């Protein structure tokens, strides 16, 4: 069994799509638009076969997102090496994204950093 896909509602669909393509190597489909409901989505595919669906529909409330809350905490992406974690973290920080931890080795042995990226949602970058 595998999780397929992960889905994320966002307000700025194009900015989110660009983020995942630029920083994490996602490939995007052409998108879907339901003219009746104005629902829009893209499926973003990654080299290992994982897919992320990013979605938008009009007038969605965007409530504050506390870093520590119930529900999903973050989406983690493995970039393959400590050096790549370091390099991507530096790039994201220089492009204005908030780094909230790392890069570091966690108590359970993961080498990672965590950023606040997409509309207050956390992205973890790991080996």
Model-derived regions: residue spans:
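A short, acidic/glycine-rich surface segment
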Residues: 29-30, 54, 59-64, 101
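Exposed loop/turn and edge beta-strand positions of beta-sandwich/beta-sheet ligand-binding modules
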Residues: 38, 71, 109
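Mid-chain, well-packed structural core segment of small domains
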Residues: 68, 74-89
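Short, charged/polar surface micro-motifs in flexible loops or helix N-caps
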Residues: 47-51, 60, 82-85
């Amino acid at each position: 069994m595998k999780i397929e896909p992960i889905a994320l509602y966002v307000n700025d669909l194009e900015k989110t799509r660009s983020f995942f393509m630029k920083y994490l190597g996602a490939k995007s489909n052409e998108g879907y638009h339901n003219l009746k409901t104005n629902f829009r989505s893209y499926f973003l595919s990654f080299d290992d076969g994982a897919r992320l669906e990013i979605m938008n529909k009009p007038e969605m409330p965007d409530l504050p997102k506390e870093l520590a809350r119930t529900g999903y905490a973050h989406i983690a992406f493995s970039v393959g090496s400590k050096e790549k974690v370091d390099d991507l973290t530096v790039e994201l920080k220089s492009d204005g994204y908030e780094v909230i931890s790392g890069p570091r080795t966690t108590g359970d042995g993961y080498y990672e950093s965590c950023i606040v990226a997409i509309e207050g949602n956390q992205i973890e970058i790991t080996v």
